[in-house]
């Protein structure tokens, strides 16, 4: 069973939840990468052995529903900058990825949830990853791959500025433990301010 939850993310259930245990995956959505999003979504669904709910993090929906209010500006070359810290960023979901725990909480998701960038291609059942973190990291708030990587070029996709910083790529795929007290306490204010 696969449910695509393209939703407005209002403070109500995104969709009627299946009675069986469901894996919840939030995928970052960027309007310039719609095809990549659809490939990622399809590859997740194709290999899933358990019910799977995929939720797109569409910044327009998140803004219109009041969940994402953080402002950004764009220069003449199309480079986006965060208004709060004036740092450049490249995708529409650079900040909204951190809304996943808030959106999960208001939609009564109580187990592990996953976020991934839209350019992922899944070749195996994602349920194995969910089971792995449930069995081996139940005491952790977040699970991710701790890459030790620094960029070698100054630009990346769509000629956006490439920055090097600690923990680069760590947030490309994250699993949040909705049972952990620190994750439960996250709110949209933590992302927007």
Where are these regions (language model features)?
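Glycosyltransferase catalytic domains, chiefly GT-A lineage
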Residues: 2-193
